[in-house]
Design a protein with these regions (language model features):
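His-Asp-centered catalytic microenvironments across diverse enzyme cores
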Residues: 10-13, 95-233
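Glycine-centered secondary-structure boundary/capping sites
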Residues: 17-26, 79, 144-145, 188
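Residue-level signal for well-ordered alpha-helical scaffold segments within enzymatic catalytic domains
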Residues: 41-42, 79, 83, 119, ...
Length: 233
């Protein structure tokens, strides 16, 4: 169990920025359920959905950015959980890039790999492991997306979501699994003690040039598209 509580290079919860957040929120003084719920809601809604420079950035950088996607929000979520003594681990997958269509458009959608490395966090709670993925999209973004496609009442894939119930996805935590991209999964990479271990084996299939283009150009275009949705445009 110690492995699921350890600080790592990516899960750097002793960083001053994270410690400052912990002190202000005082999650460590709450019962276990309220700890998980408070951290979950924080990562879901106060860390906005958006694309960071790469997957392998430490939790402190995700916090400083104020936005993230499945992998980077997961890193921050895990760091905050471990900081209050809640065991957690990472489950890795590949998702179909169709899930990103809308946020990713045109030439940069065509050039992206067919499969994208994805993850969710498994949290130990009352002697069982819960799958936690529903923190990826902040509520304001998801709400505007639901309004934009209000005629859709069943399954939906695109704009960062893949679910069987678009208008009521499983994103609210009450001792349950939460999901928002699960239906886009095409491969299961298994369970890892930490994101460091996972990303040492599985990374996005991008050439050095495409990786640079993503960091310097593409992600900014994607973030602009996400902001426009969040603003109702």
């Amino acid at each position: 169990m110690r492995a699921y509580l350890q600080e790592t290079e990516l899960l750097n919860y002793s960083h001053p920025l994270i410690q400052q957040l912990m002190n202000s929120r005082q999650w460590d003084r709450l019962p276990k359920k309220e700890q998980i719920l408070g951290i979950y809601n924080y990562v879901r809604d106060e860390i906005l959905f958006g694309y960071n420079r790469e997957d392998t950035i430490p939790a402190s950088e995700v916090l400083q950015n104020g936005y993230g996607q499945c992998n980077t929000k997961g890193i921050l979520f895990m760091a905050l959980l471990r900081a209050v003594g809640v065991p957690c681990r990472m489950h890795g997958f590949a998702i179909d890039k169709q899930l990103q269509k809308g946020a990713m458009r045109g030439w940069y959608y065509q050039l992206s790999p067919k499969e994208i490395v994805h993850s969710w966090v498994e949290v130990q709670y009352e002697d069982k492991w819960l799958n936690i993925e529903g923190f990826i999209l902040d509520i304001p973004y998801l709400t505007k997306l639901q309004q934009k496609f209000g005629q859709c009442t069943g399954s939906f894939c695109g704009y960062g979501i893949a679910t069987d119930d678009f208008q009521n996805p499983d994103i609210y935590w009450d001792e349950n699994d939460t999901y928002v991209q699960k239906e886009g999964i095409v491969r299961d990479f298994g369970i890892y003690d930490s994101p460091d271990a996972f990303f040492s084996v599985h990374q996005q299939r991008l050439s050095p040039f495409r990786k640079m283009m993503f960091s310097r150009v593409v992600r900014h275009l994607m973030n602009r598209n996400v902001r426009r949705i969040r603003q109702g445009k």
